[in-house]
Swiss-Prot record:
InterPro entries the UniProt entry points to: UPF0178 (IPR003791)
UniProt name for this protein: UPF0178 protein RPC_3085
CDD domains, sorted: PIN_YqxD-like
Family according to the record: Belongs to the UPF0178 family.
Amino acid sequence: MSPTRIYVDADACPVKDEIYKVAARHGLPVSVVAGNFIRVPADPSIERIAAGPGMDAADDWIAERAGPGDIVVTSDVPLASRCVKRGAEVLAPNGKPFSEASIGMTLAVRNLMTDLRSAGEVTGGPRGFSPRDRSAFLSALDTAIRRIQRSNKTA
């Protein structure tokens, strides 16, 4: 198994700075993936990936590489589903983990809300990102890293 890597679906990710700090503390490499150029700290453990044009280019890049022992940070539910199926730990920026048990219902709700929005039945979007979300994310990321490290020691 290759070393744990954190993959960040970077477009509109509000916790990139937190990811960089936690990854540095644990000595983990980070791949920051976006459709276009995105600014990242000058750190050899942080890899910037401009996946190129296309709505799903960044998602495809991450989904093709993430696997068991890796962590993916995304708010994109279809990407989360693909990565969970490949065995990666997946977290939303608010700290909510996506799992085999929860991803089916999460996808169904996402698709329902998309249909309701397109029919004009629902307006608006999710609530804003809060300090509580940031704190929950930091806790969830630390927990995921520790869980992977424990399983690597017993493997």
